Amino acid sequence: MKITNVEMVISAVKQEQYPAGQLPEFALAGRSNVGKSSFINKMINRKNFARTSSKPGKTQTLNFYRINDAFYFVDVPGYGFAKVSKTEREAWGKMIETYFTTREQLKAALLIVDLRHPPTKDDVMMYEFLKHYNIPTLVIATKADKIPRGKWQQHAKVAKETLRLISDDELIIFSAETGQGKDEAWGALQKWM
């Protein structure tokens, strides 16, 4: 996909702050520091558009990025980060649940997992949450450049089995370093646009 125009529209905490209009939205969910911002940057060919951080738990808002005035990537705060308080975790849970369960513009979730390791309990819970609410899900197994190509399928199989991936949902092996899986990801998103 040719990207002509990207704009960070709003960092939202409450429903009233979500952008108006009917453009399709794709929400990126995943553990803190799994590479959601790097995924966005690679997909839109920008170096540091979605700010990446080496501090886990940095994104505490829903960040809406408008792409080509055609759709949004919504960067969801990462989960599974121990250093936030119980109150913050509950507020996070409420914010995420509200977005995923009420937002009509949400077309699909992109669950970002680390291909190097089996999905965590939090990843499994997130996937089950998405399936409970019948949200179409594309699993992006990132950091593929960090393991030998010959082991990709083996790692992908573990990820699919751990998540108990249903046949409607696809897993794409991805690398923000090399661009591996980028065209495949655009192809998969296209069907919801």
Curated annotation (Swiss-Prot):
Disulfide pattern: none
GO terms of biological process kind: division septum assembly
GTP-binding in keyword set: yes
GO cellular component, one term: cytosol
Keywords on record: Cell cycle, Cell division, GTP-binding, Magnesium, Metal-binding, Nucleotide-binding, Septation
One Pfam family per UniProt: MMR_HSR1
Annotated positions binding Mg(2+): S37, T59
CDD domains named among the record's database cross-references: YihA_EngB (cd01876)
Matching PANTHER family: ENGB-TYPE G DOMAIN-CONTAINING PROTEIN (PTHR11649:SF13), MSS1/TRME-RELATED GTP-BINDING PROTEIN (PTHR11649)
Protein name as annotated: Probable GTP-binding protein EngB
Organism of derivation: Anoxybacillus flavithermus (strain DSM 21510 / WK1)
